[in-house]
């Protein structure tokens, strides 16, 4: 019995000694689970399972053993385990892996294709904090297969190399935690770029701080001059043909220091103060918290002088209060009450003074604060506005407000920011309390009545002034006038002078009291007229461009819907191109035609690229290009237009437009992009060159589909002059311009929309800024190449006033080969 107890005690003591002794290695017969850890041989670093803060999740991580737990590296950042006791960190199948629960589910792995046996591998936590997976043996003879220094987390330890692989262009990154209790990769990262500068990025794309390039003479980064005063670190930069990296060591090994890509979005340098038993913030960039991009998220307000730095404005609350408590403000703020745009009186604007204005604004040409406010009030998508007195710019925000900052009172660079709120969320600043002083109450009542009477008088005068101003046509600021039906009835002399008509109504000439001419479109048809009315007001009501027809105002009284435009004395382009022998009009010369083509392209480029939303016109044709007194082209008739938000690339809509100008994707029924307008423009450009409809019979009475004929001439180096309108004989026709126009037109009508140029590229080509390559033959028109056989075409037009000719333009869905359109490496 004694012998048995003695033997049992011996084994217990041996087991206890083995279990309590610190080891630095995980090998085939030693794993980590529960509270087990490994410790570097010098006792500096420790590794095992940990739980951040009050989180219920467990991770495998490394920390300083002798200091308060400061996590330096995490293996399974992306996926936590729920139970540390049933989870195992071990070597298996040539890898270091983490298994969650009963050895079944792999959570993390080194991801090697190793052929080494388990018994030949070991994972060692070295004295520098590097976890190394290597073949067994001494540190000198061992072969390192994987090391944690090549996979940094949020902390940069001495000896770690944040490198750039010049062969692949990829850089290692320090990436912040998502929050104080969530080590998964956050939104902020530090990386090295090709200019030898370190930069901090938001979401891997938006740079908001840079160290500047490395200066080998002074051994500092150009934008970090304080490195000259450093007495703690020895910085080193290395660069060769394959990679570049920056690393550092510490002069005094007794000092404990680290760099961290913090959840705040700042790169921070900490040193340990042994006397205080605390970390000291030695250096950080950006210096100001509010310089961090999107730190407070959407609609959040940042202030460098408050704690916490982020707050939500009036009428908003944190998207996630739990995340905000953990200093993760990235989700931003959400409205307490959603906006309702059906009634303008239930939305108001809340005034935020002395603000550094948010990013992602759009600039409107407005001349005063009141006009700017009116423009935003009238646009349901406008979430906020501000007026910059210095530059006389009206700034509006139609998307989420980002990087809004509250400036200090002594800072005079701030602006007043007006944020749209539901009226129920706007505080009643007037109802601050009651008074028992009857005299004060009586005086206040009398004063209020006096103010009300004065305000009413001012309002009446303003309304009279505005009415007179509107009737004089003084709306140069770009805002829309609301006309009464009687006013337009008088202006058009009871709609007596009809200019034309179409599927949606008729157009009449009129004059305002100041004798300025206008064109009034009276929309007809209850449903279609209402739809076109809304579409035109939304699309062109708030935009201005020299090549877009200007909408001056509107009338909406019950079923009566009218639109008021500037009058175009030279009518539409088709009336000058497609002349019959009876009509006596001036034939447009080539220079004028080319300027019309260029101006139209500029107008479309503005619609596609420079408006708040991409506007697809959907019905580009000569009938919808109006000419002013100087023959300056104006894109008109936006009744079929579609708006596409900048977050989307295409829109699914019903087929619309005019046959003969329709892109193939209209017929196939797929979602369209702005490239549908490009196709229509290409067809119209051919008609500008030829002076006739694309399907009109030629002089020798053989039916020719002009685009196929022009494509044949272009691809076979034929006579370009033969494509020009014969009525221009004797006119100074610039063949180089004709060639450029025909080439770009042929590119515009390619079957695959990805092969067509953007309208901005078309403008550059016509201006001669870009050289254009020979286009491929569009496959959908190859069947229409000129032959001896008769080809019958049929045309339908949305405008009954157009000079219709019959055509039946059949499109093929076959694609053309992808080619470069220009010589500047920009693809069509």
From Swiss-Prot:
It is a single-pass type I membrane protein. The modification Phosphothreonine is found at residue 653. InterPro entries: Bulb-type_lectin_dom, Bulb-type_lectin_dom_sf, Kinase-like_dom_sf, Pan_app, Prot_kinase_dom, Protein_kinase_ATP_BS, S_locus_glycoprot_dom, Ser/Thr_kinase_AS. It is found in: Cell membrane. Residues 582-600 are annotated as: CaM-binding. The active site is at 619 (proton acceptor). It catalyses: L-seryl-[protein] + ATP = O-phospho-L-seryl-[protein] + ADP + H(+); L-threonyl-[protein] + ATP = O-phospho-L-threonyl-[protein] + ADP + H(+). Residues 1-22 form the signal peptide. Gene3D superfamilies: Bulb-type lectin domain, Phosphorylase Kinase, domain 1, Transferase(Phosphotransferase) domain 1. Residues 286-322 form the EGF-like domain. Residues 493-770 form the Protein kinase domain. Residues 341-422 form the PAN domain. PROSITE patterns: BULB_LECTIN, PAN, PROTEIN_KINASE_ATP, PROTEIN_KINASE_DOM, PROTEIN_KINASE_ST. The modification Phosphoserine is found at residues 527, 815. This is G-type lectin S-receptor-like serine/threonine-protein kinase At2g19130. It comes from Arabidopsis thaliana (Mouse-ear cress).
